[in-house]
Regions:
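RNA-binding accessory domains that recognize and position tRNA/RNA substrates
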Residues: 1-38, 42-43, 167-169, 181-187
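Hydrophobic anchor at the start of a short beta-strand
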Residues: 28, 79, 159
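Active-site-proximal beta-strand elements of phosphoester/diester hydrolases
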Residues: 5-10, 122-123, 160-164
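Cysteine-nucleophile active-site neighborhood
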Residues: 47, 51-127, 172-181, 185
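A glycine-centered loop/beta-turn motif at secondary-structure junctions
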Residues: 151-187
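Catalytic beta-strand/loop cores that center a nucleophilic Ser/Cys/Thr
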Residues: 117-157
Length: 187
């Protein structure tokens, strides 16, 4: 599919992510986090992005979100989670999330991509981590400092997620290749 024809849904708004996707020819529609999976899928998006929002506590107040996110991940649409979206996807697929004693905060957090062994300096601002990896996922990125999970891939589904902020990466200019890999999942 041509880049200018890509059409994505985002569950929650994050301007930098939106800008990076627009730079790649994506048309963006933002839907409220209160939408059901069917409401999102009825719009026939090419892909779905789950990103920042009110925080994990807000999701925990509405038990339906877990089912909604699981349905989206299990759909035939590619799904990418960034930051809070990473945590929400892991929880929806049976993983666990834990509050950190000291969060990952700053623009100099080293992360290794497990497939290539390459290490990147990332920007992070989170106080929770995915502790238990869902059985349907594999770790794609690890924090060098504490070996915590910074990214997951869901091999049986068209889904992936990262805890860090890919568009704010420092140094290597192509670490936002995460977007390219995600957009490559669109059929």
């Amino acid at each position: 599919m041509e880049q200018d024809r890509r059409y994505l849904r985002t569950q929650m708004q994050k301007e930098n992510i939106i800008q990076k996707l627009k730079e790649r020819g994506c048309r963006i529609t933002i839907v409220p986090a209160s939408c059901t999976a069917q409401q999102v899928l009825d719009t026939n998006p090419d892909a779905i992005v789950l990103c920042g929002g009110a925080g994990l506590e807000a999701f925990e107040q509405n038990p339906a979100w877990k089912e909604t996110v699981a349905e989206l991940i299990k759909s035939d649409k590619p799904v990418m989670g960034i930051d809070l979206g990473h945590q929400v996807m892991a929880l929806a697929m049976g993983g666990s999330v834990e509050k950190m004693h000291c969060g990952h905060r700053g623009a100099n957090c080293p992360v290794t991509e497990t497939a290539s062994g390459r290490t990147f300096i990332t920007s992070q601002n989170h106080g929770y981590i995915v502790k238990e990896i869902p059985s349907c996922a594999t770790v794609s990125h690890l924090n060098i400092n504490d070996k915590s999970c910074e990214g997951l891939e869901y091999p049986q589904m068209k889904a992936m997620s990262v805890q860090f902020i890919p568009e704010a990466e420092i140094g290597q200019k192509n670490f936002d290749g995460i977007y390219e890999r995600f957009l490559g999942l669109i059929g």
